[in-house]
Amino acid sequence: MAAESALQVVEKLQARLAANPDPKKLLKYLKKLSILPITVDILVETGVGKTVNSFRKHEQVGNFARDLVAQWKKLVPVERNSEAEDQDFEKNNSRKRPRDALQREEELEGNYQESWKPSGSRSYSPEHRQKKHKKLSEPERPHKVAHSHEKRDERKRCHKVSPPYSSDPESSDYGHVQSPPPSSPHQMYTDLSRSPEEDQEPIISHQKPGKVHSNTFQDRLGVSHLGEQGKGAVSHHKQHRSSHKEKHPADAREDEKISAVSREKSHKASSKEESRRLLSGDSAKEKLPSSVVKKDKDREGSSLKKKFSPALDVASDNHFKKPKHKDSEKAKSDKNKQSVDGVDSGRGTGDPLPKAKEKVPNHLKAQEGKVRTNADGKSAGPLHPKAEETDVDDEFERPTMSFESYLSYDQPRKKKKKVVKTSSTALGEKGLKKKDSKSTSKNLNSAQKLPKVNENKSEKLQPAGAEPTRPRKVPTDVLPALPDIPLPAIHANYRPLPSLELIPSFQPKRKAFSSPQEEEEAGFTGRRMNSKMQVYSGSKCAYLPKMMTLHQQCIRVLKNNIDSIFEVGGVPYSVLEPVLERCTPDQLYRIEECNHVLIEETDQLWKVHCHRDFKEERPEEYESWREMYLRLQDAREQRLRLLTNNIRSAHANKPKGRQAKMAFVNSVAKPPRDVRRRQEKFGTGGAAVPEKVRIKPAPYTTGSSHVPASNSSSNFHSSPEELAYDGPSTSSAHLAPVASSSVSYDPRKPAVKKIAPMMAKTIKAFKNRFSRR
């Protein structure tokens, strides 16, 4: 119930985070999320980690969101990854440690000893070295006698099976603490010096007082490199112990082999206590037996905290993680170089080199035996602290590799970049080995072997990192490959290229409507179609879906120019058949008249025309379809001519109805208005005016004065007797304008300028207005 309620609360807070952009509200919701008991299942189901991680660049709540994501990263289990990484690491490191690796360390001692001896001697006193020896030897004594015989039998039994160049679990553990499994050759080199050093811890008490400067140099390096990798101080202890390995007498080798396993157990126990102290935050005073051990562990814990505390803050931010990782890689490589040189700072003249060669395989065999026994499950006790140590180290060193899967980030990209780093460090290691080989002639063979080992290692690591990146390249090839059509050979007979496979994809678009009726219905009905409404916007551009043959091109030209075909010569009917099928009956008849040879072949074409124009007619006996069509066509034309003649004769014999008659036949017609205005303007209307107006005698003056004028105007060609005739006349309304017009057209009087009607109206209004005042 509690898990379900927490899941519901997380979902509600996640929804509020996505909906509310207020910084105060966001901070409030993030604080509530930090209080809730979040589990890995809740993170996977809700995806709240991705939501909170999206606020890491926010101005107000960015720091709190990064801290919360870093806190949730600790919840993610990395046991599976750590076990798989340990196995991969051991496989990569196997058969890569030559027996004469210790010889190179001894050669480097002399060059580095003189430069560091004065500075190292003033750091600590011999008592401090003795305290360190006590601190390292006290936890080992209870285990020394109990496990000596058992581990010796296991070592003998596994010595028969294991190869001479196998990797030890202790070195692989420490190598895993410092870096991820695809480690660099510098780390491999430091592990070589680390593996035999762990078996030589009790020998420090038997060393001479003259070797104090190596202890002080190691202590000074442990203090100066607190900001470096978490295992800096422990690795310097081991390097210091390896510097005195050659000084030990030959008769103490058996004691060293017996006490090697007990010391490894003590180191694992101390590392287990250190990891628990880092996780729980408890003090180290309850865990360790002596006060000197407390001080040393506190110093190591502070160095680890200084390193891992910024690493957790930076791990949530991918942009800042990569530069810091590069800086740590550079610092680690520099420290490894110093440690390799610093191992030889306190070395004097000891046993010859063959003794060192004998010791290296023995320690490797003993530790290989321990690996085999752990794999068989015989020693479950020592395996448990190592698993816890790898879990703790993975939690601090590589939290993003497992937590990013919950945030749906991409992992192969980081693996690819790590491979590049290992290859670059491999080149630097190769250069270092070549310098060492030039310094002495004894180590020439070993210097030639190590670059080969490094090359093999880089070749193994690069495929391991390149394999996860291969699926990223597959989706990029989205474009389909074009068909690889080879160019045809040039021949006299031309053949076109085959049509592409992409052409059929255009055909469904062209055949959207199978008939004009469907297209018309789709365009003008009320229902919607999947495609747009077909609207005619001009003829579309004609295109050829494929290359046409020469024969097809010629037939196409002939179909488009049938009216230009006359004599075809000796061209057979089979060639012209597609063209003749497109001909109308008139065009076909004309071509046959020009080419009588085709008449025998075109009977089927005339049959088609007969069925189309004369559906119910059948040919007579011994009559071809062509003859039938011509006969029926002539009969139809004759009927049409007869019908036309009948209609024409019917219209000719029809009685005429109303006829149009001219008005003013016996009088002068009134000219149109525009003509009259032009006549008045230019004085061209005087031709109709008589030259001399004759006035009737006095008896007729008593009547209308307009009558003689009208008579004279209408009969100006008549004699004076006719003027005396007082016959019927038209109305006076018509005569008055005629008389006035005759008077106005008098050329003896000047033409009066007529005022426009609108102007006359305006002038009249002005006169009436001014007259009232």
Curated annotation (Swiss-Prot):
Which regions are flagged for Basic residues bias? Answer: 234-247
Q: Region (BC-box) spans which residues? A: 549-558
Q: Where do the record's region annotations for Activation domain lie?
A: 521-680
An annotated GO cellular component of this protein is: site of DNA damage
Q: Where is the F-box domain?
A: 565-609
Q: Which domain of life is it from?
A: Eukaryota
Where is the protein localized?
Answer: Nucleus
TFIIS N-terminal domain ranges (all copies): 4-79
Phosphothreonine, modified sites: 390
Give the Polar residues compositional bias ranges.
Answer: 112-124, 728-744
Spell out where the chain crosses the membrane.
none
Q: Which residues carry this modification: Phosphoserine?
A: 82, 195, 309, 379, 515
> Where are the stretches annotated Disordered?
81-477, 671-747
Q: Which residues carry this modification: N6-acetyllysine?
A: 430
GO BP term, example? transcription initiation at RNA polymerase II promoter
Function, please?
SIII, also known as elongin, is a general transcription elongation factor that increases the RNA polymerase II transcription elongation past template-encoded arresting sites. Subunit A is transcriptionally active and its transcription activity is strongly enhanced by binding to the dimeric complex of the SIII regulatory subunits B and C (elongin BC complex).
Subunit structure of this chain's protein:
Heterotrimer of an A (ELOA, ELOA2 or ELOA3P), ELOB and ELOC subunit. Part of a multisubunit ubiquitin ligase complex consisting of elongin BC complex (ELOB and ELOC), elongin A/ELOA, RBX1 and CUL5. Interacts with ERCC6; the interaction is induced by DNA damaging agents or inhibitors of RNA polymerase II elongation. Interacts (via BC-box) with CUL5.
What name does UniProt use for this protein?
Answer: Elongin-A
Q: What is the lineage of its organism?
A: Eukaryota, Metazoa, Chordata, Craniata, Vertebrata
